[in-house]
Amino acid sequence: PSREELAVYIEEAAVSVTNNYEEAPAVLMVDDAVIGTLGNFSASIGKAKSKKTFNVSAIAASALSGRTVLRYRSMFPENKRKILYIDTEQGRHHCQQVLKRILRLAEMPDDKVPENLIMLSLRKFAPRVRLLIVEEAIGKTPDLGLVIIDGIRDFLYDINSSSESTEVISKFMQWTDDKQIHIH
């Protein structure tokens, strides 16, 4: 960036003691504990086959239905009800099974396309293309409030590359801040 651009960035990033800044709205809870706010991201971590996808399905079902699902509660504003669910590891058949599970948990019919849930299977794409697809989907989806990414490591060519990891996390921070969404 040029010096002029840096000056603009500094101005944009300045925090003043006299300004009023709104607290990020809580949108995801487990019981009464906040686990997600708009403008931020969270993660489910665990060993392979430790039911992370099932756990995330319950989060998606709660956000989709507005009800408590397996102790998860969600409170997305009216203009933030759209969910984008991205799976980087599984093919379309498996993703469809996850989609049906989410709909069952949300007590919604699994023979009708849900209005507020978009699922993408990105297994066949290269890591860089996956990231670009997600960026485009986030940018063009109106009323987006929640983005679930199952398989964040698949955005990286080298899981041990700190520069690649920093680049992906920086994108997440940019998207959550610019779009005021929650990424999980």
Set out the residue ranges of the language-model regions.
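Conserved inter-motif catalytic segment of the P-loop NTP-binding fold
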Residues: P77-N160, E167, Q174
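Conserved structured core elements
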Residues: F54, S163-T166
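Structural recognition of the conserved hydrophobic beta-strand(s) that form the central parallel beta-sheet
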Residues: S44, I148-D150, Q180-H184
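C-terminal regions of RecA-like/P-loop NTPase motor modules
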Residues: P1-R3, K140-T141
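The Walker A/P-loop phosphate-binding site
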Residues: S2-R101
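Hydrophobic beta-strand residues in large extracellular and virion-surface proteins
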Residues: V27-L28, L117-M119, I183
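Substrate-engagement module of ASCE P-loop NTPases
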Residues: T166-H184
